[in-house]
Amino acid sequence: MNQKQVIAERLAAILPSLEVEAIYNLLEKPKSSEMGDIAFPAFSLAKVERKAPQAIAADIVEKLDTTGFENVVATGPYVNFFLDKAAISHQVLTDVITEKDQYGKLNIGQGRNVTIDMSSPNIAKPFSVGHLRSTVIGDALANIHEKLGYKPIRINHLGDWGKQFGMLIVAYKLWGDKAAVEADPISELLKLYVRINAEAEEKPELDDEARQWFKKLEDGDPEAHELWQWFRDESLVEFNRIYDKLDVTFDSYNGEAFYNDKMDEGIQILEEKGLLQESKGAKIVDLESYNLPPALIMKTDGATLYITRDMATAMYRKRTYDFVKSIYVVGQEQINHFKQLKAVLKEMDFDWSDDMTHITFGLVTKDKKKLSTRKGNIILLEPTLDEAISRALTQIEAKNPDLENKEEVAHAVGVGAVKFYDLKTDRDNGYDFDLEAMVSFEGETGPYVQYAYARIQSILRKANFVPNAENDYKLADTESWEIIKHIQNFSAVVERAGDKFDPSLIAKYAINLAQAFNKYYAHTRILDESPERDSRLALAYATGLVLKEALRLLGVKAPEKM
């Protein structure tokens, strides 16, 4: 049990006017470590007790069961708790050594399913750094939920349907070269896509033609379907090569096209419930009671829309996976779409729509400018990852020229640097893509955390340290205590990251733990013979294990040597 919980329960036993949870939420960290580790402010009791907060604090100290604490004192209106550092450090180090990579695991999910809609690139368009966020945030959220006891189901809802295929078919029929497309599919298809969009601005009839071709595709026209299948197959080969490089896997690649024959059920339910209304020849669901614009379900030409397909998708996923959470990792520009989707499902009496959560994220820019596939202003992800690996290799060769498997380590560091930089950013904030900053071994970066882990492994190898849970490891000095508190807090950080759907909490935790250890290492001679040597090595071991696990949750590898 964490110490705040112990304090809250002890205080609740003598403060009948406050519940344990309320007390827990009032507990805070004193301004200085000299004033203790945890403080309870007595202000909130002044009205009820009709006493000055200072007097209440003194009364609490007199009545409280202080067993297991180094000291408990009243300082003005605060009750300050000094924790038993030796006892807690022993418990924390023993727990980490016993539980290993299971340390911090919780069983909140009890094995229940969580679907995570993530990555979802558009077929026939290049995989750019713009797709990186949904991919790595989704993967990290899957890892975090697994650590919390859920069963994550990673779904790559491919953008393999829509008007853009009408545009692409028109472009290919006008200017396409089969041999050129087969030689370099994505690059050639991108050129066609950019060209058709540019020309359509001058010639609106191209838009009409694209719409007609997409309608043909929906109706099963053989020529349209053959071209669509070809675009899809060629794109997936390239996407899977990039996913392998990122070390990201999926449980399902069911994209938009998969739901072509699954939309009638949702439309039928809307009709049966009298929710479908005619509006200028189109069919809509009125959402005025939700303060939302009407949801357009079917256009005048009978073509379906994203929301129709997403209704079918949600219904299929609930039926197939019986999720307790359905997470959609999709950019901020889709906020209204997901609000409408949930509202329509709610109107259909699907209460499980409350379990659907849209996880937004900010934009990636380059030189502060927005990236756009349509305008051809993008940064391709694969060559960017290769450049990150190359930069990592250059730095590794400078630091450790004799390192074995340099290429493998450079891959882990380069790819990890790009992923970590993305994930350390507050989810709803965007960031400017800066490869030099990402791959730096200094500052708040992935390589900095990886290097701290590798340094710890080097210390443990030199000492031939073998952890033993039976040993009486304990430390009571201030420097060690800072690290112990970080390690003890790991499961709480994982839980909060899951609650807030925010992997940046794990990334920041890893940075703080690495910084705390590096500071400790600079001031403490860990390998020197002393009564604390084994306990210090146990602390290094525990720090390394938790750093590695934090990085794993972010989808980042931790090399043993750098």
UniProtKB/Swiss-Prot annotation:
Major subcellular location class: cytoplasm
Protein name: Arginine--tRNA ligase
Listed NCBIfam families: argS
Quaternary organization: Monomer.
Keywords assigned by UniProt, alphabetized: Aminoacyl-tRNA synthetase, ATP-binding, Cytoplasm, Ligase, Nucleotide-binding, Protein biosynthesis
Compartments in which it is found: Cytoplasm
Span(s) of short sequence motif 'HIGH' region: 121-131
Catalyzed reactions per annotation: tRNA(Arg) + L-arginine + ATP = L-arginyl-tRNA(Arg) + AMP + diphosphate
GO MF entry, a single one: arginine-tRNA ligase activity
Biological source species: Streptococcus suis (strain 05ZYH33)
Source taxonomy: Bacteria, Bacillati, Bacillota, Bacilli, Lactobacillales
EC assignment: 6.1.1.19
Pfam family, one: DALR_1
GO CC entries: cytoplasm
One of the protein's GO biological processes: arginyl-tRNA aminoacylation
Enzyme class: ligase
Stated family: Belongs to the class-I aminoacyl-tRNA synthetase family.
Gene3D superfamilies: Arginyl tRNA synthetase N-terminal domain (3.30.1360.70), HUPs (3.40.50.620), Isoleucyl-tRNA Synthetase, Domain 1 (1.10.730.10)
